[in-house]
Each structure stands twice: as structure tokens, then as C-alpha cells.
């Protein structure tokens, strides 16, 4: 019982810290909360969180070629040229504050291309578990965290996965656009959703 209370107090303390960071970020950007009810976490706030514990950031892939009139990069099942530019811009901004992270993607052309352009040369590990959503995605995240408990993790996945996580963890309706993301962390074997990543 005492152990449970300590764990509960620690979780509450972390949540209060997260709220404070989100509020501070909100003063300098737009609002601390998105319209969907998720806390907004920008690069600087994310960097502060990463100093407390490793973070897991899941991004939707960049603009799909087969659903756009923009020029394709190559394969029609991949992303557009505009998508590569957007992914590189996001990656540059992200890496400026979180330079050290392990990179993963699902096994589709569009997520692999997005992760490749985001990383600018960082090693990419393709993991088909990030194509399927549901409780399986939590198991995959915890597995990666167990293998490298001190590393930040970036995962390129799909909109339905992000929508599922937001609804399951915070009962939030999240309809991610290209390259939108969620910030999570693992604590004592449980996966927590901290908020929505916003790039400024």
C-alpha cells in the first residue's frame, strides 16, 4: 500500500511538472492546451522533459504521394518532394534540442522515407510492429525502452496509431496531420501519454 502511494505521488508530481512546463511554453507560443484537450509540448518543453527521463516521440509520416497532386519523391507508395522538405525541416528543429535519439519506423515506404529525411543520416531501424495499432504498440514501445532505457526514441508510424493512443490514454480525439506527433514516456513498465508535440 505504501509503495502504491509513493508511486501515485510520484506520478502526480510528474504530472504537475508537466503542466507547469506546458503553461510556460504556452506563454511564449499559443496555448498550453490543444483544442483536442492534449497538452502542447514544443521543442524546448520536450528538451526539459528529456532531462527528467527518456522520451518517446511518435510522428505520423510526411505527405503521401498517392493522396497528393505534389511531385512524388520516387515510389508512388512513398512521400512527396514537399514531404521530404517538411521532414528535413522538422528533423533539424527537433535535433537542435534533442540530438541523441534512436530512430524507428514501420515497414512502409512512406514511414521509412519520412524517417530517413528527418534524421539526415542517423541509423534507422525498421520495425513492422509500428504498422499495427492497439495494445501491441505499447508492448513494442516498452520493448525498445527495455533494450535502451536511457535513450530517447523517435518512431515514424501512422495516423490511426496516433489516434488510437490519444483516445486510449487520454480519451482525446486526435486527428493528426502529416508529421504531427505525440510525446510519451515509460515509467515502471507502463506507457504514459504526455501530450501533443508542436513544432515551433
Swiss-Prot record:
Pfam families to which the protein is assigned, alphabetical: His_Phos_1
Cellular component per GO, a single term: periplasmic space
Q: Does the keyword section mention Membrane?
A: no
Q: Which residues form the signal peptide?
A: 1-25
InterPro entries, per database record: His_Pase_superF_clade-1, His_PPase_superfam, LipoPS_heptP_Pase
Major enzyme class = hydrolase
GO BP? lipopolysaccharide metabolic process
Enumerate the subcellular locations listed in this protein's record, separating them with semicolons: Periplasm
* UniProt keyword annotation of Transferase present: no
Record EC number: 3.1.3.-
Which Gene Ontology MF annotations are present?
phosphatase activity
Where the protein is mainly located, per its record?
periplasm
Arranged from A to Z, the UniProt key words for this protein are: Hydrolase, Periplasm, Signal
Pathway participation: Bacterial outer membrane biogenesis; lipopolysaccharide metabolism
Q: Name the protein family.
A: Belongs to the phosphoglycerate mutase family. Ais subfamily.
* HAMAP family assigned to the protein according to its UniProt record, in alphabetical order: Ais (MF_01868)
Function of this protein?
Catalyzes the dephosphorylation of heptose(II) of the outer membrane lipopolysaccharide core.
Q: What protein is this chain from?
A: Lipopolysaccharide core heptose(II)-phosphate phosphatase
Amino acid at each position: 500500500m505504501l509503495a502504491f502511494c509513493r508511486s501515485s505521488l510520484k506520478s502526480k508530481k510528474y504530472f504537475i511538472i508537466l503542466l507547469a512546463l506546458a503553461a510556460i511554453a504556452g506563454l511564449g507560443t499559443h496555448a498550453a492546451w490543444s483544442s483536442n484537450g492534449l497538452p502542447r509540448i514544443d521543442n524546448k518543453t520536450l528538451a526539459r522533459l528529456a532531462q527528467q527521463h527518456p522520451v518517446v516521440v511518435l510522428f505520423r509520416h510526411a505527405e503521401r504521394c498517392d493522396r497528393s497532386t505534389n511531385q512524388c519523391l520516387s515510389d508512388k507508395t512513398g512521400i512527396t518532394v514537399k514531404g521530404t522538405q517538411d521532414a528535413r525541416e522538422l528533423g533539424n528543429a527537433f535535433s537542435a534540442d534533442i540530438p541523441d535519439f534512436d530512430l524507428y519506423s514501420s515497414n512502409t515506404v512512406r514511414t521509412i522515407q519520412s524517417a530517413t529525411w528527418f534524421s539526415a543520416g542517423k541509423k534507422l531501424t525498421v520495425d513492422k510492429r509500428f504498422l499495427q495499432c492497439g495494445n501491441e504498440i505499447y508492448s513494442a514501445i516498452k520493448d525498445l525502452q527495455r533494450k535502451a532505457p536511457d535513450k530517447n526514441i523517435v518512431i515514424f508510424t501512422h495516423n490511426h496509431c496516433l489516434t488510437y493512443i490519444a483516445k486510449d490514454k487520454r480519451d482525446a480525439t486526435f486527428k493528426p496531420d502529416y508529421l504531427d506527433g505525440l510525446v510519451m514516456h515509460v515509467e515502471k513498465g507502463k506507457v504514459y501519454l504526455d501530450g501533443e508535440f508542436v513544432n515551433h
